[in-house]
C-alpha cells in the first residue's frame, strides 16, 4: 500500500473496512504531511485534537461494523464553511476571531457520514478571486512547478487551499465552493477532480455567502470515484435552505460503469476563443477523440450567448455580493475598527469595512452597489439577468436535442505564476472563468477532470457539463474520460 496520506477516499475506505489500517493511522499520516507542507500555506486553522478524537470514534464504529459512507476518512474543509467552535473566517480580516455557534449543513452531513476534519483550508477572501492571492492568510502555493523552474505558481481560486491540499496529499479530499468556477479552475490547475453539482443539490446553509444565486458546494478529490463518494455524502435536502432541492440523492458511485456508448457529447463552437493557446485546443481535440473512441457520438453545438456570460456574471455576482456583505459592520461579530473620540456609527461602519475588506472585495462591493443603484439598475443589473435567462435557454435547447453532456476545456491556460496577474487589469484575471461561468449562470452540474500535462509539465483540465440533476450520468461520463486519459502524474515533492 502507498503512504496512507496518498490514498484516495475509495482505497482508504476499502482498507479501513478490510481492517488493513485505522482511521487513527490515516489521520496521523495526514497531520504529519500537513506539518511538513507549511510552505504551501494550504491549511490555515488546524484541528488536530478534534481530528484524532473523531478518528478514534470512527475506529470504534468500524469495529462494530456499522460504518457510514465516509467513516474514518480525513478531509480538509474550505474556510467558507461554518464549523462549530472552529474559526471560520472566509479568508477575511473582517471575520477575525469568529467562532460559529453552529455547523454548516454540508459539513454536518460529512460529520454524520463519519468524515474526519483535519482543519480549515485557505481561500480567496469571501471566495472572490481566481488565484488565491486575495486571502488575509497570504498566498497558497501550488505543489506543481514548471520544469526546471522554481517560481511559485497559483493553485487557482477561490478554492486554492483545497486544491493544493488534495494535490499534495495533505488530505484524502476537501470541500470547495463554486460561484463562477472556484472548484473547477483550481482542480484543473492542480491535476485533481472537482465537481460543481446542480444548483440546489448541496445546501448553502452555513456557507458564508458570496453570490447566493450562483454559490454551490462540491468536493475536490483525487479521482472521479472519490468525487462520487463525497458528493453523495455532502448532498441532500435541507429545509433551512429555501433553494435546496427536495430530491432523493442517487448512489453516485454505483453509476460509474465507464460505459458511454451511444451518449451524445456536444462540442460548443463558441468555446473556440480568439487567441486560445494551441495546447488548450490540442487538449480539447484529444478529449474529443477519447470520447469518440469510448463509443460516444460527437455533435457540434451552438451556445450563442456564451460571449455575454462573463460580463453578465461580473454584474450579477458583485450585485449579490454587495448585498450579502452589507451585514459585516463590526457591530455583532468579527473585526471592529478602533474609533477616534467623537466618531459615530457611520464612522464605525466606514473604518471597519475599509480595514476589514481587502481591495478585490472592496472593488466588487463597489461594482455591485453601482449596478444596483437607481440610475443603473435597468441598464446593468436587469440586462444581465435577461442575458442569464438566454444563456440558460441555450443549454436547454441543446439538451432538448438529445445531447447528454458538453465537453470543453476547463481553463484557458495552465497555472500561472503568483503575482503574474495581480498587477494586470483585473479583467485579465476575470478571464480565467471564461469556460466555467456559464455553468453557474445556468445552474448546471460541471466537472473538471485532468486531461494531461502541458509542455512545462503542468496539469491541464477538461470540463464536462451535464443536464440538471443528472450528476450520476455526468460522473460516469467523467469516469470514462478519466479512464481514457489515464492521468497518474503527481507533483514532485519540493516542499
From Swiss-Prot:
Query: Reaction catalysed?
Result: L-glutamyl-tRNA(Gln) + L-glutamine + ATP + H2O = L-glutaminyl-tRNA(Gln) + L-glutamate + ADP + phosphate + H(+)
Q: Does the keyword RNA-binding apply?
A: no
Gene3D superfamilies hit by this protein = Amidase signature (AS) domain
E.C. numbers? 6.3.5.7
Presence of the UniProt keyword Ligase in the record: yes
Positions of transmembrane segments:
none
Example GO CC term: the record gives: glutamyl-tRNA(Gln) amidotransferase complex
| InterPro entries, per the entry | Amidase, Amidase_CS, Amidase_dom, AS_sf, GatA
- Top-rank taxon of the source lineage equals Bacteria
Instruction: Provide any one GO MF term from the record.
Output: ATP binding
Where in the sequence is the active site?
78, 158, 182
Alphabetically sorted, this entry's keywords are: ATP-binding, Ligase, Nucleotide-binding, Protein biosynthesis
Return any one Pfam family short name: Amidase
Q: Which GO terms describe its biological process?
A: translation
How this chain assembles, per its entry, is: Heterotrimer of A, B and C subunits.
Q: What does this protein do?
A: Allows the formation of correctly charged Gln-tRNA(Gln) through the transamidation of misacylated Glu-tRNA(Gln) in organisms which lack glutaminyl-tRNA synthetase. The reaction takes place in the presence of glutamine and ATP through an activated gamma-phospho-Glu-tRNA(Gln).
The record's comment on protein family reads: Belongs to the amidase family. GatA subfamily.
Q: Could you tell me what this protein is called?
A: Glutamyl-tRNA(Gln) amidotransferase subunit A
Q: Can you name the source organism?
A: Roseobacter denitrificans (strain ATCC 33942 / OCh 114)
